[in-house]
Amino acid sequence: MSGSTLGKLFCVTVFGESHGPAIGCVVDGCPPGMTLGESDIQHDLDRRKPGTSRHVTQRRESDTAEILSGVYEGRTTGTPIALLIRNEDQRSKDYGNIAATFRPGHADYTYTQKYGFRDPRGGGRSSARLTAPIVGAGAIAKKWLKEKYGIVIRGYMSALGPLDIPFESWDEVDNNAFFSPNAAIVPELEQYMDALRKSGDSVGARVSVVAENVPPGWGEPLYDKLDADLAHALMGLNAVKGVEIGDGMQAARQLGTEHRDEITPAGFLSNHAGGVLGGISSGQAIVAHVAIKPTSSMRLPGRSVDLDGQPIEVVTHGRHDPCVGIRATPIVEALTAIVLMDHALRHRAQCGDVASGVPIVPARLD
């Protein structure tokens, strides 16, 4: 199949291209009766949209969401919800010089090999522009999860290139352009990005996400485990090259006595597993991290080939994010919410009336 749909019971199908007339998605499976309006979706879209600081692409898009179906008199009807976001600031002429070649490290080459040709304008279907409707769908899922289960999903940037960002406070995340939870390091991040932009290069980033108040029991072993589906969704985000759940790769260096999350009647003593055991939520916070590569669209020349396989030097013009990770936090939150809502509905369908009889252990010691 085409790979444009995420989820099984809560399904999100994305459509559009970066420089087409519009982008959007169809959200199928949202239960009826939830109050929903465009303002519920717009907040997260505004957090993601371009042109919000000097450190991101200067493409100017209002990213205004239109609800075309699935909502009547301010409530979801249980039928598919269609969201539309119109593209307003395309500059397709900026891509004329790369239409007959391939940016090294970009999907230009692989899209052409797969489909036989490609839309070169802004990356076409491979553009991060397509994450806007995902954020819209994620806002719906976040609202439902919060109202139904009290689940709160929050993300932050935990590293920018070589700069680690120590976590300090959730209160700081939306107070700066980097989604940094640490106000003290923001001036250093700004200086780093200013120098990077002047150099013409790009850089990667690490984004972390935490979902709190997820009940125990969600996840479908063996092959639809909660962490497997979360990793699958997060790997679908543009430029993501790695996903960690909990301690992730560090688990390979740990001893069993260190990694195991010991349990007491008063609560779990640690959360190295990231809230998932055996592919099923434990009731602890779901914790994931994504590694985002540097964008390949930059003004520094690089070697490549043209459509005839002949060597050529590529320089990318146009408006690009020098670090795509800066705007990724709302997208990572959205994908996490979509996966959790899908699993909430799947768990309710199969095991909604199961009573284990085992007391629920608090997520952590207070």
From Swiss-Prot:
UniProt keyword Lipid biosynthesis, yes or no: no
InterPro entries the record matches: Chorismate_synth, Chorismate_synth_AroC_sf, Chorismate_synthase_CS
Biological classification of the source: Bacteria, Pseudomonadati, Pseudomonadota, Betaproteobacteria, Nitrosomonadales
Gene Ontology molecular function, alphabetical: chorismate synthase activity; FMN binding
Binding site for FMN: R125, S126, S127, N238, A239, G278, K293, P294, T295, S296, S297, R319
UniProt function note: This reaction introduces a second double bond into the aromatic ring system.
Gene Ontology process terms (BP): amino acid biosynthetic process; aromatic amino acid family biosynthetic process; chorismate biosynthetic process
Keyword Nucleotide-binding assigned: no
Gene designation: aroC
NCBIfam families linked: aroC, PRK05382.1
Binding residue positions for NADP(+): R48, R54
Family membership noted in the UniProt record: Belongs to the chorismate synthase family.
Catalytic activity: 5-O-(1-carboxyvinyl)-3-phosphoshikimate = chorismate + phosphate
Entry keyword set: Amino-acid biosynthesis, Aromatic amino acid biosynthesis, FAD, Flavoprotein, FMN, Lyase, NADP
Designated name of the protein: Chorismate synthase
Details of cofactor binding: Reduced FMN (FMNH(2)).
Associated pathway: Metabolic intermediate biosynthesis; chorismate biosynthesis; chorismate from D-erythrose 4-phosphate and phosphoenolpyruvate: step 7/7
Superkingdom per UniProt: Bacteria
Subunit organization: Homotetramer.
Named cofactor requirement(s): FMNH2
One Pfam assignment: Chorismate_synt
Native species: Thiobacillus denitrificans (strain ATCC 25259 / T1)
Gene Ontology cellular component annotations, sorted alphabetically: cytosol
E.C. designation(s): 4.2.3.5
